[in-house]
Amino acid sequence: MERLKSHRDFVAVLKRRRRVSREDIVVHYLMHDDVVTGDTATVQGRRVGLAVSKAVGNAVTRNAVKRRFRVLARKYESLLPESCDIVLRAKPSAARADFLSLEQQMASCFEAVKRKTASRQ
């Protein structure tokens, strides 16, 4: 799984306003066939970006949340459609959530994305 790196890619995903939300996680998604113009249309495979704001906590806390999200995204990436961009956004409560809870939420979100995009493939 590749990473979303550029601001343009993040904005493209967030602009589409397609998302799935749980207690501590919001998953924004964009199918590559949704993109009309831009560099994103030429990319194949899944790409994931992380958005953890200062509202989540200090730098140490934010980095811990990002590490957890990366591990969980790798674990459940097979649930996602082949050609999509995902932005995982942490809600402030994610800092206090235990790993098992985050794992269940991530699996649930990725399943929901898969269901919502199944008709498009």
Swiss-Prot record:
<comment type="similarity">
    <text>Belongs to the RnpA family.</text>
</comment>
<dbReference type="GO" id="GO:0000049">
    <property type="term" value="F:tRNA binding"/>
</dbReference>
<dbReference type="GO" id="GO:0004526">
    <property type="term" value="F:ribonuclease P activity"/>
</dbReference>
<keyword id="KW-0540">Nuclease</keyword>
<comment type="function">
    <text>RNaseP catalyzes the removal of the 5'-leader sequence from pre-tRNA to produce the mature 5'-terminus. It can also cleave other RNA substrates such as 4.5S RNA. The protein component plays an auxiliary but essential role in vivo by binding to the 5'-leader sequence and broadening the substrate specificity of the ribozyme.</text>
</comment>
<comment type="subunit">
    <text>Consists of a catalytic RNA component (M1 or rnpB) and a protein subunit.</text>
</comment>
<dbReference type="InterPro" id="IPR000100">
    <property type="entry name" value="RNase_P"/>
</dbReference>
<dbReference type="InterPro" id="IPR014721">
    <property type="entry name" value="Ribsml_uS5_D2-typ_fold_subgr"/>
</dbReference>
<dbReference type="GO" id="GO:0042781">
    <property type="term" value="F:3'-tRNA processing endoribonuclease activity"/>
</dbReference>
<dbReference type="GO" id="GO:0030677">
    <property type="term" value="C:ribonuclease P complex"/>
</dbReference>
<protein>
    <recommendedName>
        <fullName>Ribonuclease P protein component</fullName>
        <ecNumber>3.1.26.5</ecNumber>
    </recommendedName>
</protein>
<keyword id="KW-0255">Endonuclease</keyword>
<keyword id="KW-0378">Hydrolase</keyword>
<keyword id="KW-0819">tRNA processing</keyword>
<dbReference type="InterPro" id="IPR020568">
    <property type="entry name" value="Ribosomal_Su5_D2-typ_SF"/>
</dbReference>
<dbReference type="Pfam" id="PF00825">
    <property type="entry name" value="Ribonuclease_P"/>
</dbReference>
<dbReference type="GO" id="GO:0001682">
    <property type="term" value="P:tRNA 5'-leader removal"/>
</dbReference>
<keyword id="KW-0694">RNA-binding</keyword>
